[in-house]
Amino acid sequence: MSSNHPLGGLDGIAFMKAVGEVREDFQFLVNDILLNIGNLSPLFIPVNKVGANARAALKIIDESYAKDIPILVFPAGLVSRKMDDGKITDLVWQKSFIGKARRYKKDVIPVLVAGENSKWFYNLSRWRTKLGIKANLEMFYLPGELFKKKNSTIKVTIGKAVSYADFDKSRNPNEWAMFMREKTYALANKN
């Protein structure tokens, strides 16, 4: 299952809740720092976002994909940003989930989570980028963004599965990732 990543925390919780209503046996590829959330760590597959993934970490990812369970991913790997046109959208989706879907014969279900962070969050991201600061400073403000959403409702829309067999040689993995990204954002027009 692949989803956009508009909120950076609450969207993951909403994603897990939506899937958990149908299946309890799932795992979620997440930033390895989230393993510190003890109650949720059994559901998490760690991904090192600041360095290279060690061989042992890659083995854990492959072992998880080999199981007959849903794997939840945010293919962008980072929280959505405000683009020059004013739209809140994910950055480029990484192709690895397409390769894993092919290798482990897992269909991919597009999931759209609605929502956005504060203007301050997006302004920080924009200024950091303009100033050439590579460190993802806005990540440190995501817990605050989560608490700003107190008493709000997060809408999660689940699309139709795309068979792993559809990810053929007619497109390269990057193009298939873009295809899934487009299918995900098209779910905004579903309701």
What are these regions (language model features)?
Residues 3-52:
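Catalytic core of membrane glycerolipid acyltransferases/transacylases, capturing the structured
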